[in-house]
Regions:
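Thiamine diphosphate
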Residues: 32-100
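N-terminal glycine-rich anion-binding loops that anchor highly charged ligand groups
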Residues: 7-41, 60
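Active-site mouth loops of central-metabolism enzymes
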Residues: 1-7
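Residue-level marker of alpha-helix boundaries and capping positions
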Residues: 4, 12, 27, 49-53, ...
Length: 100
């Protein structure tokens, strides 16, 4: 039987990303999403993690990795999604090779 683990939401997101095979994660820090990247650091041997100067750049890093065939993730708080809108609109037309 699987072991039950109690986690905070952001910790569970990081664990889920790791278990789903995410290899690249880029994030713009801001509460409450900052902790996702902080929890991902524990998987540093398997996941490349970086802070981005803004949400658009974080999304572009994740899109670039995905276009190269690597499963990736961009983390930001919901109000930063408007800053990341341009690359999100573009990738919706281009498609991806790895998961995003």
């Amino acid at each position: 039987m699987a072991e039950k683990v109690i986690m905070l939401g952001n910790e569970a997101i990081a664990r889920g990303a790791y278990e789903a095979g995410v290899k690249v994660s880029s994030a713009y820090p801001g509460t409450p999403s900052t902790e996702i990247s902080e929890y991902l650091v524990q998987y540093k041997d398997d996941v490349y993690e970086e802070w981005a100067p803004n949400e658009k750049v974080a999304t572009e890093v994740a899109v670039g990795a995905s276009l190269a065939g690597v499963r990736s993730m961009a983390c930001m708080k919901h109000v930063g999604l408007n800053v990341a809108a341009d690359p999100l609109y573009s990738v919706s037309y281009m498609g991806v090779n790895g998961g995003l």
